[in-house]
From Swiss-Prot:
<keyword id="KW-0963">Cytoplasm</keyword>
<keyword id="KW-0456">Lyase</keyword>
<feature type="site" description="Necessary for preference for fructose 1,6-bisphosphate over fructose 1-phosphate">
    <location>
        <position position="357"/>
    </location>
</feature>
<dbReference type="InterPro" id="IPR000741">
    <property type="entry name" value="FBA_I"/>
</dbReference>
<dbReference type="Pfam" id="PF00274">
    <property type="entry name" value="Glycolytic"/>
</dbReference>
<dbReference type="InterPro" id="IPR029768">
    <property type="entry name" value="Aldolase_I_AS"/>
</dbReference>
<dbReference type="GO" id="GO:0006096">
    <property type="term" value="P:glycolytic process"/>
</dbReference>
<dbReference type="GO" id="GO:0004332">
    <property type="term" value="F:fructose-bisphosphate aldolase activity"/>
</dbReference>
<keyword id="KW-0704">Schiff base</keyword>
<protein>
    <recommendedName>
        <fullName>Fructose-bisphosphate aldolase, cytoplasmic isozyme 1</fullName>
        <ecNumber>4.1.2.13</ecNumber>
    </recommendedName>
</protein>
<feature type="active site" description="Schiff-base intermediate with dihydroxyacetone-P">
    <location>
        <position position="225"/>
    </location>
</feature>
<dbReference type="GO" id="GO:0005737">
    <property type="term" value="C:cytoplasm"/>
</dbReference>
<feature type="binding site">
    <location>
        <position position="142"/>
    </location>
    <ligand>
        <name>substrate</name>
    </ligand>
</feature>
<dbReference type="InterPro" id="IPR013785">
    <property type="entry name" value="Aldolase_TIM"/>
</dbReference>
<keyword id="KW-0324">Glycolysis</keyword>
<comment type="similarity">
    <text>Belongs to the class I fructose-bisphosphate aldolase family.</text>
</comment>
<comment type="pathway">
    <text>Carbohydrate degradation; glycolysis; D-glyceraldehyde 3-phosphate and glycerone phosphate from D-glucose: step 4/4.</text>
</comment>
Amino acid sequence: MSAFVGKYADELIKNAKYIATPGKGILAADESTGTIGKRLASINVENIEANRQALRELLFTSPNALQYLSGVILFEETLYQKSSEGKPFVEILQENNVIPGIKVDKGVVELAGTDGETTTQGFDSLGARCQQYYKAGARFAKWRAVLKIGPNEPSELSIQQNAQGLARYAIICQENGLVLFVEPEILTDGSHDIAKCAAVTETVLAACYKALNDQHVLLEGTLLKPNMVTPGSDSPKVSPEVIGEYTVNALRRTVPAAVPGIVFLSGGQSEEQATLNLNAMNKFDVVKPWTLSFSFGRALQQSTLKTWSGKKENVGKAQDVFLARCKANSEATLGKYGGGSGTGLASESLHVKDYKY
């Protein structure tokens, strides 16, 4: 029995289980103002609130796309925004059986005593902010920790600091009614092979779940948002089947069965590659006590963004592209994706070194 004593236990378990519904996944639309500015700049669109709102409205009102989503991660600005018709985005999502979530961290800062490793900030007034987000309709939260693989990295200090930070955030969120996404992202930057990534992933996840248990976090009211286990960005590529096997094995060794779902970040992979890898994991024939799904940002939005290009007349076409990507990833969560949605834009790599958002 969990030592969790918060009043929201039943609600947390119910919401986490729903988010992990097979066939559904997460749209990560929580880019900071600076990061979405870079995305808009790539299509020559000015970074003003009206344009940020227009992009989010395009996504949230795409006909038939939301049936493939169980949650959407929002940035604070977006949590309070409305559609052009005056309807709050939160209501639009809720009416389509999509749970709104919120990014609660404030980005990373350098961890003193390390060679450029980082820790995540955002604990100031976190409890009060969670209360406000809950009142606004959010029912889950995301906190991103970032680790890197290098000659001596991640250091033990970095692993422990980030694990303890994730656990501290987790219990504060749960005490205020928010399911938490635990996101210890190991960057793909580097020339390491897939076995090295697997070993580091296992070490980091083991530390995270030790810290979560020490903080009496209710695991049934959490989801894990990890990196896929892949070779470094400067290493030779391997097949989706190899990535699927290494990833699932690493998770089976470290993630308790009490966790209802694991939703992967795309980590700069192309849209199509991320989908193929997710499909391979779900086809890998071993016992998996949790659902394996997606929590993609760039890998759901990039070709949609390019198709839209900030023009009203392109909204319909862009929404069709978004629907196709949502459907493809839904199929991948069931191990039923046959490929073929990756022509053109969907095959472009989205890797950004030392990615921050």
